[in-house]
Amino acid sequence: MQKVRPGLRQLLDAVGDVPAMVLGRRADVLAGNRMAHLLFTDFTALPAAERNLTRWIILDPSAGALFRDWKTVAAEAVGALRMDVGRHPNDPQTNQLVGELAVHSEHFRQWWAGHRVASRSAGTVRLHHPIVGDLELNFETLSLPDDPDQMLRVYSAKAGSPSSDALTLLSFGEAAAVPEPEPARRDDS
């Protein structure tokens, strides 16, 4: 099981004004700050086996409603998963995830059959959040040299933009309603 270093967890909390998360193999969500949970979903509230960004994007209807370019985002997530399969072809958790997605999503089956391998370390996502409306956020995905299977993904908006204002509103408007995310339990797998 992958672990997030305490210093990295501290960094996530320190960049509390912007959504940030640590992704592991298969795009497992290993940790996220409060803004990531407000913007996307509270992955810590999900069963351990469901704390996966690709799984959430493909199978959760709230993700389909959130991403304005859902098909593009989902197809890119499938391409990144295929890249992970290439790096770790005999990983049982990866094979289980691919099987689950194939059983439950026709889109996934089509994209998987296309054999597209891709990974973007930076880009833009367009969202329609149920509380703050439309956002356009840039993301950067940074590799972590101490653990090549972990990445830090940070989402930001251009300063002074309506998206920046929406993130501020989301942060302040929901501050009392959403508790700080709990770290993953040691017995998670």
Label every model-predicted segment.
Residues 2-189:
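Hydrophobic protein-protein interaction segments
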